[in-house]
Amino acid sequence: MKLAFVNPYHVKQSKEMDDNSPRKTDEKDPKTIAKLVTEGRYSFPYLPEGIYAELREAVSVRDQIVKAMNAAANRIQRWLTIYFPEYLKVYKVFDSVSGLTMLWQAPLPEDVVKLGADGIVALWHEKKLRAVGKKRAQTLIEAAKSSIGMPGGNCAKMNLHLLLEDYFTKKEQLERITAVLQEELLKVPNSEKLLAVKGIGIITVAGFLAEVGDLRRFTSPKQIQKLAGLEPKENSSGKHKGRTSISKRGRRKLRRLLFQAVLPLIRSNEDFREVYTYYSTRKDNPLKGTQAVIAVGCKLIRIFYVLLSHGADYSSTRFRADILRPGQAKAALRTTRLYSGKRPSVKMLN
């Protein structure tokens, strides 16, 4: 027997069609659901199989590890705020190798002072840390001498050791699951095409495939855009033109992943930055900050779809082609004719 899925929102919106009553009971719901099924308003849930199921499981495990690792890091920084707040002024990030070595051997300010500059340097040399020296050790000692942290004892030290052990464990687990994720990702056909795009990493591609699954079930990138909840939601009637927003339906993790991937792309990739600038500064219908980011995210979906489906290589020229407008197209035609001696087609430029 094959199971079908009826959207609960459809049931809620359809419950008044027969009796014109907002009443909702266990007797009424089955009738409403059966009516929707007879009208063909149902769908079959998609369950990824094979490599896509493995990727979804691996990405889910990685998200759990990252969440636990961040929680452990926050607890460590809380401990430092209570007992040694000056540590966070000496080290901008608490998890530097030399800093973690000090926290394990001399967690409290009095331990740092007791160890002395020579002892700290010897400890770092024992761990083969060459990027730090006596100057950093002296800075740490001065911070410890003027510390305003609460006095701590053996229990405070033990608490920090347990927190550090938890953090180290999660960090090691993160490295293991990332290695497995990379190994599984390379089994997907044409996945290396996506990794060739500047600013696109393993986590982004793996997360995209984990949420979308097999791309062969889609006939258009707009279907993936709808799955991510980035479909434009128009609100207009007659002469009234309401505000257009995104639907925010579908897989929210996919929508979050695309948003998090586009922001660094705009900063590090010249092609994406140029398209973002065009969307936000064009004369006709310029987009605001978030709107332009969403537009670039939808374009990223189309790129992923083409590269994975057709095995094509990423082309910077084709990526920027849609920002050419009639005036720019004429100039591009003249430039192309000047350097190539051939008459290019307008279709090639648009």
Predicted regions: what they are:
Residues 1-350:
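A detector of single, family-specific signature residues
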